[in-house]
Amino acid sequence: MEFNSEFLATLCARGYLHQLTDATALDGIMSSGAVTAYIGFDCTANSLHIGSLMQIMLLRYLQRFGHKPIVLLGGATTKVGDPSGKEKTRAMLSEDNISANKEGILRVIKKFLSEDVVVVDNAEWLGNYGYLDFLREIGSKFSVNVMLGLESVKSRLSRDQQLSFLEFSYVLLQSYDFVELHKRYGCILQIGGSDQWGNIVSGIDLARKMGCPQLYGVTTPLLLNSSGAKMGKTADGAIWLDETLYSPYNYWQYFRNVPDQDVGRLLRLFTELPLSEIERLEALKGEELNEAKKILATAVTSICHGAEVALQVENQALKVFEHNDHDELRSITFSRKTLGQGIPISKLLHMWGLEESISAGRRLIRGGGCKINGGVVLDEEKLLNCGDFDDNGGYVAVFCGKKRRLKVVLED
């Protein structure tokens, strides 16, 4: 359908929209005035990664179009653990861990949003809610028959995977969050990933049973690449939005190196470039598409880390990859004593984090994919010794494939 609301029309045009409840009614409300909406983040890590970037972009669009976003931090629900999309029970976190994670997540979110965003912790109302009172007042309004049909529950049980009562009850807590946010802030819209659909609909149903007016829900699609795999992680781990956990340089490189087929979609999702410009960029072919990837990488990095940092890392990357400036390579030090009489390059690639195993290093060398100081390594048993460093000014430049590059400086 065509939306009158700028917010929903943008979601539809840029590929954010997966499911929504009562589209016509929600569109009418959002096109006639400001709406309060919330997105929740449990505090399971001390940062968010790009798997949460769609939700963060929607918070930005809510602000842009004059609506009122609420960021809900799960200080209480983190203690329980959402089973949605998980194959096993999450590890229990201590109060100190949750508190530290909450601070880290908040620090990330504030980079993306203006200062007037409302931030709330559901521990404010769930933390002191008595167990028996909660069961009587909230639990009585849920049907176990319906709960067993939730995808988060059904998928675990169908695979004969353990689901604790703690996780089973998570939907009650998230549902009550929606009710409480409506009471306190007049919130009528909850936004989440597609795995949150069951929890969102349950919250709408609970609100109706507790006498609230009609509430609404919107979900975004899973973040998948063109081959159908989840995006958000590399061999080195998650693509964190905190610069201390994942450098702006690596962040830029990640988006610069996405598959050709993903460029247009990621430009729509993670940049604020006009759609007409995105259509022009995604129509580029061959080598020209690399320019679109650079624009994508710089635009995404600018939103996360700031325009000045984005320009710096773009220039740094271009010096390394297009002008072979070794001074701009990521640098590590390596002990002369450790190197001794020489170590096989295949082993060093693993030690330096460039390959996941020694055998992977050997395969790379056999395929001609490893260069040391510009020369292709042909012998998978070749040793690297101190002379290789001394003959090159005290360092070696290691290139693995097209993307992994490292400057290793020898120290006494």
Swiss-Prot record:
Q: What is this protein called?
A: Tyrosine--tRNA ligase
Please list the residues that bind L-tyrosine. 38, 170, 174
GO BP terms, alphabetized: tyrosyl-tRNA aminoacylation
Position of sequence motif 'KMSKS' region: 230-234
Q: Which residues form the S4 RNA-binding domain?
A: 343-409
Q: What does this protein do?
A: Catalyzes the attachment of tyrosine to tRNA(Tyr) in a two-step reaction: tyrosine is first activated by ATP to form Tyr-AMP and then transferred to the acceptor end of tRNA(Tyr).
Question: Pfam families under this entry?
Answer: tRNA-synt_1b
Q: Which family does it belong to?
A: Belongs to the class-I aminoacyl-tRNA synthetase family. TyrS type 1 subfamily.
The short sequence motif called 'HIGH' region sits at 43-52
EC number in record: 6.1.1.1
Question: Which keywords fit this entry according to its UniProt record?
Answer: Aminoacyl-tRNA synthetase, ATP-binding, Cytoplasm, Ligase, Nucleotide-binding, Protein biosynthesis, RNA-binding
GO MF annotation, one = tyrosine-tRNA ligase activity
Which GO cellular component terms are attached? cytosol
Q: Whom does it interact with, and what assembly results?
A: Homodimer.
